[in-house]
Amino acid sequence: IKIMVERDPIKTSFEKWANPGHFSRTLAKGDPETTTWIWNLHADAHDFDSHTEDLEEISRKIFSAHFGQLAIIFIWLSGMYFHGARFSNYEAWLADPTHIKPSAQVVWPIVGQEILNGDVGGGFRGIQITSGFFPIWRASGITSELQLYCTAIGGLIFAALMLFAGWFHYHKAAPKLSWFQVESMLNHHLAGLLGLGSLSWAGHQVHVSLPINQLLDAGVDPKEIPLPHEFILNRDLLIQLYPSFSKGLTPFFTLNWSEYSEILTFRGGLNPITGGLWLTDIVHHHLAIAVIFLIAGHMYKTNWGIGHSIQEILEAHKGPFTGEGHKGLYEILTTSWHAQLALNLAILGSLTIVVAHHMYSMPPYPYLAIDYGTQLSLFTHHMWIGGFVIIGAAAHAAIFLVRDYDSTTSYNNLFDRVLRHRDAIISHLNWTCIFLGFHSFGLYIHNDTMSALGRPQDMFSDTAIQLQPIFAQWLQNTHVTAPRFTAPAATASTSFTWGGNDLVTVGTKVALLPIPLGTADFLVHHIHAFTIHVTVLILLKGVLFARSSRLIPDKANLGFRFPCDGPGRGGTCQVSAWDHVFLGLFWMYNAISVVIFHFSWKMQSDVWGNISTQGVVTHITGGNFAQSSVTINGWLRDFLWAQASQVIQSYGSALSAYGLFFLGAHFVWAFSLMFLFSGRGYWQELIESIVWAHNKLKVAPAIQPRALSIVQGRAVGVAH
């Protein structure tokens, strides 16, 4: 095995930090002339490409920056656990999760609990939290605040290790360029992160989570439950709960795996006590994932010479109509970090959105399903993160095209062919957007008009002209009936949302029930299709035209972001790849807003609510989604106004502190937006007269103040 590192390449010194712009070529030439340097500093601090041309140096910076990122994540996690240990009512919640609300943020008594959620239960004074950490802690077997303390300290130790690793692999033993091999990276990430990660989590769940949750579900007092290490060290404790533990690993090696069926189950549905997935199902899932990925982590050929060669697979991939096929794609992935990143971000972003949809349909943690605020927060959080990450995929795809793309190695392959018929792709997408926009909006306009004219029988709704989502309903039905044929041992389908007549309630609250789909969902679904297609249109146009267009044939020379193609060429502003990312973000926001509105109203109308002793379910908004959401007016009146009025009227309720913060945040937002609306020229003129006054008094600064450039102004604008 070759030595793949370079020893002591860069000495550790803080002197560089005192030297302004040690990574900026413009600043290195001398002191900055104008205040624009501050903005450029923010824009370029992490743009390693602009600091150096050397791919090895860029790769090392990325590698060590990842350790820094991990350190920040560990510090953040540690903070969460510390808050749970020091400022939370976790132990009280654990003893009575249906009546006590989670809180991990104490407030000075002078503020008064009566303006902060009222009583969170158990006489605790604090703000109700909606991060979902309590259910995660219970699922992982944490029974006391002391354990949270220990985990928080562990997090800090890991953060320190990561910071050390980041420093060590840049200053002491920096990897050579030949060390960054795609096959090795794939193998290690598949086997290490996903394989061993899942295996260790499955192990933890079997030995710690399962027994502790079993006892908690049975109503045992958390203080009487043995500590995690006792379950690990003393097998007899486990055998009392799960007799098959007495057989050890014998059934595993003799392939008699059914012996383990009490810890590795395939039940489907939810645990009726906690409203979460069966923990034994989750263990089974992670064990299976671990096996798959440990095998997958040995698939690719490295210097050991066994396994698949990605290059060979790609180059063999040719169709009758696709020219050179995938030839040349391997070179793209091995020479451009941006290309790799774009691919990974697109996949990760899509997965994050899939997670958002699983958190409510298959709630993984105990008592998560009845904490509606947390459910709403988790859905919103994962949708937004997924949206941002997908936009990032388009951004890095465009940067790859501008900075890293080499057309000679990609002649007539699939990538080249996509670029060559980009006009057809974009014009088709454009037509799709127009079609979806007019038709989906048109259905609503029709309904509003008929409603206003008093002709409900002529509206598109479940009670008049039906537009049932028959394919979605067929899919739901398939999932309800499938387990009988595909998994005879399963007691329920994968999710109760598919249909059937299962209703899971915890305490007096609904955890989950079948979600019916009707005309209202069909209409809003097409709004989703419309907004997503527009986002894709903008992003894809930015990527496909990043290097050149009919308007600006030499776009690649202007770079990833530029305001206009110089003076004297009107109509060439805001055409850079960066500007497409900017516009894409706005449409991503449009798309996700509609998704969150749909989710929020649908769940409150058809799923969430209380159940009476007679078994009658009363939903939060009384099942009004199907009839109200088929008109724009219904959305405005019965969703936006009905929900916003609670915030506006909150000043006299137990939520008043939140209402005031909400108001204050909007003031800050509007105040700063005001400066963006008033135009750059106005500010530049104002600045210059102020500079003139300073000059008169001989107190003028050496660095000349300057208004934001177009790109900078739009960057601040998009943050708003």
UniProtKB/Swiss-Prot annotation:
Superkingdom: Eukaryota
GO CC terms of this entry: chloroplast thylakoid membrane; photosystem I
Subcellular location: Plastid, Chloroplast thylakoid membrane
Keyword Metal-binding: yes
PROSITE patterns: PHOTOSYSTEM_I_PSAAB
GO MF entries: 4 iron, 4 sulfur cluster binding; chlorophyll binding; metal ion binding; oxidoreductase activity
Binding residue positions for phylloquinone: W683
Residue intervals passing through the bilayer: 62-85, 148-171, 186-210, 282-300, 337-360, 376-402, 424-446, 522-540, 580-601, 655-677, 715-720
GO biological process terms held by the UniProt record: photosynthesis
Cofactor binding: number and manner: P700 is a chlorophyll a/chlorophyll a' dimer, A0 is one or more chlorophyll a, A1 is one or both phylloquinones and FX is a shared 4Fe-4S iron-sulfur center.
Binding site for chlorophyll a': H666
EC number from the UniProt entry: 1.97.1.12
Membrane topology designation: Multi-pass membrane protein
Task performed by this protein: PsaA and PsaB bind P700, the primary electron donor of photosystem I (PSI), as well as the electron acceptors A0, A1 and FX. PSI is a plastocyanin-ferredoxin oxidoreductase, converting photonic excitation into a charge separation, which transfers an electron from the donor P700 chlorophyll pair to the spectroscopically characterized acceptors A0, A1, FX, FA and FB in turn. Oxidized P700 is reduced on the lumenal side of the thylakoid membrane by plastocyanin.
Alphabetized PANTHER family for the sequence: OUTER MEMBRANE PROTEIN, OMPA-RELATED, PHOTOSYSTEM I P700 CHLOROPHYLL A APOPROTEIN A1-RELATED
Family to which this protein belongs: Belongs to the PsaA/PsaB family.
Assembly and oligomerization: The PsaA/B heterodimer binds the P700 chlorophyll special pair and subsequent electron acceptors. PSI consists of a core antenna complex that captures photons, and an electron transfer chain that converts photonic excitation into a charge separation. The eukaryotic PSI reaction center is composed of at least 11 subunits.
The protein, known as: Photosystem I P700 chlorophyll a apoprotein A1
Organism expressing this protein natively: Ephedra tweediana
Source lineage: Eukaryota, Viridiplantae, Streptophyta, Embryophyta, Tracheophyta
Record gene name: psaA
